[in-house]
A protein has these predicted regions:
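Short, solvent-exposed loop/linker segments at the N-terminal edge
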Residues: 133-141
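Short glycine/proline/serine/threonine-rich loop/turn segments at secondary-structure transition edges
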Residues: 30-33, 73-78, 156, 196-211
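Hydrophobic/tyrosine-rich beta-strand signature of extracellular beta-sandwich/beta-rich modules
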Residues: 83, 163, 212-214
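Short strand-edge motifs at loop-to-beta-strand transitions and within beta-strands
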Residues: 19-21, 63-67, 178, 186-194
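N-terminal carbohydrate-binding accessory modules
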Residues: 129, 213-265
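Accessory beta-strand-rich segments of carbohydrate-active enzymes
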Residues: 9-122, 126-128, 152-153, 168
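Beta-strand-rich binding/interaction modules
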Residues: 50, 140-181, 190-192
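Conserved, mostly hydrophobic/aromatic
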Residues: 52, 109, 147, 210, ...
Length: 265
């Protein structure tokens, strides 16, 4: 960011600037790979160029975004990445407040290499995996795992999708395994439902976390294409006017906090 002094001055800089970065890649690195750029945070308006071509525009400094650069990178010459950033907006008062509009790239930027078949990286720059708990009790938890798989190859792909719930020791306590077919340059949305018997419930006093592991392998299950892990706390809650907030059936007094993210998520 160009606002390193924003905590100590009221009239910090609200303007636009350019970032430039040169990088190299070669044909061997790109073979059977997809290449992505992920920006964790750029404030407030970002235009991303690669080798002089505008790839994407992103509005908002508090959300990450990802762009596929596979077809734009050069393997025979240096690549020039340029990002034009503007944190000025004359229509939004005040200039200063109880939070800081840090200008520029103020979080990490990642260059990600993925197999041709992988878990989607462009779904709002998330992990591509969403875990929900349709029903939870002390006896049983139903776990929904959703996501999108993509195939950027010119041929249809037949793959193995393995969804596991792991305990804190890494032991598999619930699992779903099946074959999926993805058309050439296509996508496949999935949802797997798993049952967890006698779950260890999460609470502030006992913050037990499971881990949901989603693996994508070749049709024989030998070659790992992609893998993502998502932490999972199994719990249920309710709110009503008479009894207030309850966690896992027990009353819990909530003490809130107000903290602006400013620099880090």
């Amino acid at each position: 960011t160009w606002n390193a002094d924003a905590y100590s001055t009221r009239n910090y800089r609200r303007a636009s600037s350019w970032y430039k970065k040169e990088f190299r890649t070669d044909a061997a690195q790109m073979r059977d790979k997809q290449l992505y750029l992920k920006f964790d945070g750029v404030n407030s308006l970002a235009d991303v160029y690669l080798n002089g071509e505008l790839l994407t525009t992103h509005k908002g400094g508090y959300s990450a975004f990802t762009v596929d650069i596979t077809d734009k990178v050069r393997t025979d010459a240096p690549n020039l990445l340029m990002v034009h950033v503007n944190n000025q907006n004359d229509r939004i008062p005040p200039l200063s407040g109880d939070f800081t509009i840090f200008g520029g790239i103020y979080r990490n930027v990642w260059l990600i290499s993925a197999a041709k078949q992988h878990i989607s990286l462009t779904d709002y720059a998330s992990t591509g995996i969403y875990v929900d708990l349709p029903s939870v009790s002390e006896d049983r938890a139903e776990i929904s795992v959703r996501g999108t798989l993509v195939n950027r190859d010119v041929r249809r792909a037949v793959l193995k999708l393995d969804v596991e719930v792991l305990d804190t020791d890494g032991k598999t306590v619930a699992q779903s395994l099946r074959s999926v077919r993805i058309d050439a340059d296509g996508a496949f949305a999935f949802e797997e439902r798993l049952q967890l018997e006698k779950p260890q419930l999460w609470s502030p006093d006992s913050p037990y976390l499971y881990s949901v592991k989603v693996s994508l392998k070749d049709v024989r299950g030998k070659v790992l294409k992609d893998e993502t892990r998502v932490p999972l706390g199994v719990r249920w809650f309710s709110v009503d006017a008479q009894e207030g907030f309850k966690l896992n059936g027990e009353p819990l007094k909530l003490m809130g906090a107000c903290r602006h993210q400013d620099q880090m998520p």
